[in-house]
């Protein structure tokens, strides 16, 4: 399935053909924002921590730029990957754990990010992983994985924009679900812990069938 205005052939390439993997990093500043393996969940940055260089863990080495992609090398099936978008206009340095592969591409970063999150790419990653409890892939093996991609920048943009919009809709729906779940928990607590005397179940329910049908529910809520 493709957008109708595009017809050129897709090309086969390895990740290292279209991106720099773990590019040389600048020197760490005295303080920086650190992204560890627990900070990212399904593409979202869930935790931000500012730390001092002398207190930083040894894994804090990858200085990241805007639009750099972080690929989770440990348990990559979780797909906790992240594309970095600068959250402020200051010169604050951002540093990622070496548990991520840092990917800097000249193609559309959003397009490559979505490509790396596909099931097909993930399967190729998993067969190259070592370890059972914590399967992991090293950056050198990740760089050699081959895949088809469109070299057309306009097509890359349209594909990534569509997938971005879908992700935004999913994120919005998930937030609505979280709020409804919180509301349900609050109502349940109020209804079950309101201090009213306990009553027998048979005094408040009328059970006519083990299978609940819509027409069995009375206007009073009994069934």
Q: Where are the model-predicted features located?
A:
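Non-catalytic DNA-recognition/assembly elements of restriction-modification systems
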Residues: 2-25, 193-223
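DNA target-recognition patches
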Residues: 19, 23-55, 211-223
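A short beta-sheet element
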Residues: 58-121
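A short glycine-rich beta-alpha junction/loop motif
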Residues: 77, 92-98, 130-154, 211
